[in-house]
């Protein structure tokens, strides 16, 4: 099990990926305690002095002008959580809930939220005991924060709603009891601190980024395999070409292709003196297209890493000055735009892969048997597998539509511009699954193509990629039930069998 000592505001990309991938035992670094306590003292002073401060002793949203009596402050926070837990849809899986909770803990522990250490520790206890609140996937517009998802998360702290413990959905109070935990009572501002923030949006987009990273690597390997299968040239990957343009993503993508292809191979030597002058764009322009995608991945990582360590609560408590200031850090526009750009990259990675598959189907372009199978006519080979890839690539074109340009006013027009970041991030998961399916078909096709270059081999890394597939999926000598092979290749991709062949590139 992964152990993580959390220094608030300093989560790394590798740590975030690890939190998503496996259970974690959290410990809060002691350096955070003074800041947390100071922010609570500031809130308590405001209550004691009778000053009016939004979210502490007022209503919320359009009801912000309503002053709440001191004796009602605890009930105010509980009511907020209950009323805002209005999500809908399938429950998020444990990995997503875990990532959301760790992001929330990281933000609250920065000491700008006026929430007691004991509440943060209660969240940490849920993570460590693997008690996972039931959080519906839908219901947030990404401003004012991810209210509904985070309210569902917070219900479990109060012993309300449902939670999963040891794989079973239980009433939250029962799940807490089985895990040796107890419900808590919220004090002034604490319900709002728990609910306000971009943690669900950020977690959704981070998962999209994690998957896009693996897809990018897999597509580089499969693109190189296809280049070999159709007797493509290594010349378009020459470093001098890409240095002349100067686009960093393109330069680095070309380097990755050179890494997996190496300088030559038996296949490359077999057509060294051929008369072909140029390859089709789907081969020749791989560094340019994949480089542009790599740039989007890197920019998204930069934005999402900042947001993962951000304070996106409202209002914020500045304990040193004794100020509580309302702002808009809950607005997830940076996350929405990052997710939209990731969508473009995921779609293009799949679109380029599909074009390479189509290239292999055409005997005139590939110099291989039609549809990569002998005795064509009796056998249809990869004919419909390519159609499946085309269908998936086409779906992604519609899914890539930007969400950040959409907005619907909420809360009686008080919250009149929103980010739609949760939907922007969540659709990335479907897009990633589609692109993974496309790449799986290309992997199958490219290995079949290389098999058909009888007696010739590719580079050592590409032969590793071919061996990894051939250990599970045999060569096609004649038609057989195709879907299980695509499913198998997809599972191998999801496991990271090709991802691990590349050095770190983000």
From Swiss-Prot:
Protein name: Histidine ammonia-lyase
Signal peptide: none
Species annotation: Citrobacter koseri (strain ATCC BAA-895 / CDC 4225-83 / SGSC4696)
UniProt family annotation: Belongs to the PAL/histidase family.
This enzyme's EC code(s): 4.3.1.3
PROSITE patterns: PAL_HISTIDASE (PS00488)
GO cellular component, one term: cytoplasm
InterPro entries per record: Aromatic_Lyase, Fumarase/histidase_N, HutH, L-Aspartase-like, Phe/His_NH3-lyase_AS
Modified residues (2,3-didehydroalanine (Ser)): 144
A Gene Ontology BP annotation from the UniProt entry: L-histidine catabolic process to glutamate and formate
Catalytic activity annotation: L-histidine = trans-urocanate + NH4(+)
């Amino acid at each position: 099990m992964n152990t993580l000592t959390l220094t608030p505001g300093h989560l790394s990309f590798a740590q975030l990926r690890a939190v998503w991938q496996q259970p974690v035992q959290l410990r809060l670094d002691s350096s955070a305690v003074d800041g947390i306590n100071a922010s609570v003292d500031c809130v308590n002073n405001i209550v004691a002095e009778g000053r009016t401060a939004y979210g502490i002793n007022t209503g919320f949203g359009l009801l912000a002008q309503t002053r709440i009596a001191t004796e009602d402050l605890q009930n105010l926070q509980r009511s907020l959580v209950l009323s805002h837990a209005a999500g809908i849809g399938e429950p998020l899986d444990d990995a997503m809930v875990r990532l959301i909770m760790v992001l929330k803990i990281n933000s609250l522990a920065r000491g700008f939220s006026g929430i007691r250490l004991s509440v943060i520790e209660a969240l940490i206890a849920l993570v460590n005991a693997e008690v996972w609140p039931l959080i519906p996937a839908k219901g947030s517009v990404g401003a004012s924060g991810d209210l509904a998802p985070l309210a569902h998360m917070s219900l479990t702290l109060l012993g309300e709603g449902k939670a999963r413990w040891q794989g079973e959905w239980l009433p939250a109070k029962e799940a807490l009891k089985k895990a040796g935990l107890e419900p808590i009572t919220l004090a002034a501002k604490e319900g709002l601190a728990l609910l306000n923030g971009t943690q669900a949006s950020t977690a959704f987009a981070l998962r999209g980024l994690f998957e896009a990273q693996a897809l990018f690597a897999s597509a580089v390997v499969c693109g190189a395999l296809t280049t070999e299968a159709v007797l493509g040239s290594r010349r378009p990957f020459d470093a001098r070409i890409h240095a002349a343009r100067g686009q960093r993503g393109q330069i680095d993508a070309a380097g990755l292709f050179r890494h997996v292809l190496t300088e030559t191979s038996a296949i490359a030597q077999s057509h060294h003196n051929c008369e072909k002058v140029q390859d089709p764009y789907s081969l020749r322009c791989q560094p340019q297209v994949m480089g542009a995608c790599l740039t989007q991945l890197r920019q998204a990582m930069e934005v999402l890493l900042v947001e993962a360590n951000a304070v996106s609560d409202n209002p914020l408590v500045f304990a040193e000055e004794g100020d509580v200031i309302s702002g808009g850090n809950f607005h997830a526009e940076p996350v929405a735009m990052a997710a939209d750009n990731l969508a473009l990259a995921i779609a293009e990675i799949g679109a380029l892969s599909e074009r390479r598959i189509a290239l292999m189907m055409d005997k005139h372009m590939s110099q291989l048997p039609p549809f990569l199978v002998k005795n064509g006519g009796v056998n249809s080979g990869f004919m419909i597998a390519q159609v499946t890839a085309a269908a998936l690539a086409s779906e992604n074109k519609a899914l890539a539509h930007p969400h950040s340009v959409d907005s619907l006013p909420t809360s009686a027009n008080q919250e009149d511009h929103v980010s739609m970041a949760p939907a922007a991030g969540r659709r990335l998961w479907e897009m990633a699954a589609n692109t993974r399916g496309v790449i799986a078909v290309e992997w199958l096709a490219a290995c079949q193509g290389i098999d058909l270059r009888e007696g010739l081999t590719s580079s050592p890394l590409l032969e590793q990629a071919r061996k990894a597939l051939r250990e599970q999926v045999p060569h096609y000598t004649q038609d057989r039930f195709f879907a299980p092979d695509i499913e198998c290749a997809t599972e191998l991709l999801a496991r990271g069998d090709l991802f691990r062949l590349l050095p770190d590139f983000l």
